[in-house]
């Protein structure tokens, strides 16, 4: 499907210098204008999003490729990064934010690292090194990434790590088909406790992602399923198994809690339609998006509780297929496929990212294409396959919403061959921080990560 001509995705900058080996994933910091990238060269590189240059290189913690990383939220005074590697371990790294959590602070970090970044030197401490050849020694500890702890438990490659909204729980998943949940005891000694190991997946678990406000975990797997996990009576267990994809599910991501579809200027009573959509949407909560080897991007919506109770069957087994003696039927959730987004990829889709600021979606994959989608409210339009229905109540009628109120997803921008001939492994949204940004706005950039080692930053012009 052709993108609308009113939107354009343009290259803003490459992150320099790049890794000379495959890069897997880029994780923007939740508060600072920096991004961490994972590489096959066993390192994590931290770049500035203000000038797109390398700030530091984290080395020495892993023996094989670093596949994934995630920043811990709600940490004051320091940055905490979790990394997952093909060596089957998870590393926790810390760095004091002595420069402060402001853009001015990032400039301070630049001044502290005035060396030639391309030299990519480390301090040789055997754990973590920050590129720094100009320190006087007194502040050296403040400038280093500290290798805090190694979490060991998986039997094979770690594919994804994700912190819970509170930052107290860390979820990890692996090729060994398991999902582990670790609790950060926050005792000052970097101690973590294993609170759950889930092994219901029948294949390599590719991705884990936490609900934006609840302690609910979503996972995606080589077994073509998406599974939802919650804690019940001090035990973690599966509450839903979503089947719909016809191939490996590579990635899942959650909608932001405050997301609202855009209302076209020609939509009559746009404010009323938006209010009605929000009211109906609140019954189900944030939706889930997934992408797959089957070249589709799908959106899933949880049924409201009243509707779930109405549809529940008096069976000794819940919707997950687990006996009720282990997992009570009342804890099961029912998820519906809300829509399949417009077909826009020719090969496997590796990552889909849901912007928490704008509600737009971006997808990338083996075809080297970047696709950006936008959801729009429509009233009384002709039916299309990408249109979505509002949540329904137990009697099957639309909940507090006119029958004609719908949303539809449209492709608004595409870039072919974004990294030349190379596959794109990951895409993420980040708040724009360079000098070209528009002040007073929530302007965003897209960050794409590819097989050739490059990481590119893109702007979307509407």
From Swiss-Prot:
According to the record, the residues making up region (Disordered) are: 116-140, 303-323
Q: Which GO terms describe its cellular component?
A: cytosolic [4Fe-4S] assembly targeting complex
Pfam families (UniProt xref): WD40 (PF00400)
Gene of origin?
cia1
Tell me yes or no: is DNA-binding among this UniProt entry's keywords.
Answer: no
Q: Which InterPro entries does this one have? A: CIAO1/Cia1 (IPR028608), G-protein_beta_WD-40_rep (IPR020472), WD40/YVTN_repeat-like_dom_sf (IPR015943), WD40_repeat_dom_sf (IPR036322), WD40_rpt (IPR001680)
Segments annotated as WD repeats = 15-57, 61-103, 153-192, 200-239, 244-310, 344-383, 418-459
- Keywords of this protein's UniProt record, alphabetized? Repeat, WD repeat
Query: What's this protein's name?
Result: Probable cytosolic iron-sulfur protein assembly protein 1
| Stated role | Essential component of the cytosolic iron-sulfur (Fe/S) protein assembly machinery. Required for the maturation of extramitochondrial Fe/S proteins.
> Gene3D superfamilies per the record?
YVTN repeat-like/Quinoprotein amine dehydrogenase
Gene Ontology process terms (BP): iron-sulfur cluster assembly
The record's family statement is: Belongs to the WD repeat CIA1 family.
């Amino acid at each position: 499907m052709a993108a609308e001509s009113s939107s354009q995705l343009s290259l803003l900058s490459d992150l320099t210098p790049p890794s000379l080996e495959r890069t897997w994933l880029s994780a923007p910091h939740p508060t600072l204008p920096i991004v961490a990238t994972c590489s096959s060269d066993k390192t994590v590189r931290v770049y500035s999003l203000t000038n797109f240059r390398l700030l530091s290189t984290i080395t020495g913690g892993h023996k094989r490729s670093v596949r994934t990383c995630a920043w811990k939220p709600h940490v004051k005074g320091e940055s905490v990064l979790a990394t997952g590697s093909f060596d089957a371990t998870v590393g926790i790294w810390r760095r004091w934010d002595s420069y402060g959590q402001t853009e001015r602070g990032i400039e301070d970090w630049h001044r502290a690292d005035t060396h030639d970044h391309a030299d990519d030197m480390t301090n040789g401490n055997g754990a973590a090194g920050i590129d720094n050849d100009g320190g006087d020694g007194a502040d050296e500890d403040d400038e280093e990434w500290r290798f805090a702890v190694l979490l060991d438990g998986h039997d094979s490659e770690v594919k994804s790590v994700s912190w819970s909204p509170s930052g107290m729980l860390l979820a990890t998943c692996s090729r060994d088909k398991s999902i582990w949940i670790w609790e950060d005891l926050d005792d000052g000694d970097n101690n973590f406790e294993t609170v759950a190991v889930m092994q219901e997946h029948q294949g390599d678990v590719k991705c884990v992602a936490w609900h934006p406000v609840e302690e609910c975990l979503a996972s995606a797997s080589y077994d073509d399923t998406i599974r939802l996990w919650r804690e019940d009576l001090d035990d973690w267990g599966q509450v839903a198994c979503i089947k719909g994809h016809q191939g490996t599910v590579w990635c899942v991501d959650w909608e932001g809690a405050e997301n609202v579809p855009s209302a076209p200027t020609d939509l009559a009573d746009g404010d009323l339609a938006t209010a009605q959509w929000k009211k109906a949407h609140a019954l189900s909560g944030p939706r889930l998006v997934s992408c797959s080897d089957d070249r589709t991007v799908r959106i899933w919506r949880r049924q409201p509780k009243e509707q779930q109770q109405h549809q529940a069957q008096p069976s000794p087994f819940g919707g997950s297929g687990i006996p009720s003696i282990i997992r009570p039927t009342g804890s099961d959730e029912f998820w519906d496929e809300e829509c399949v987004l417009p077909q826009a990829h020719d090969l496997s889709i590796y990552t889909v990212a849901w912007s928490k600021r704008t509600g737009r979606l971006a997808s990338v994959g083996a075809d080297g294409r970047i696709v950006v989608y936008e959801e729009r409210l429509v009233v009384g339009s002709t039916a299309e396959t990408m249109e979505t229905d509002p949540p329904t109540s137990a009697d099957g009628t639309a909940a507090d919403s006119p029958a004609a109120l719908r949303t539809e997803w449209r492709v608004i921008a595409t870039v072919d061959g974004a990294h030349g001939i190379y596959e794109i492994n990951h895409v993420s949204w980040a708040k724009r921080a360079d000098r070209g940004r528009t002040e007073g706005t929530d302007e965003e950039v897209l960050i794409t990560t590819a097989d050739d080692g490059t990481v590119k930053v893109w702007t979307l012009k509407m």
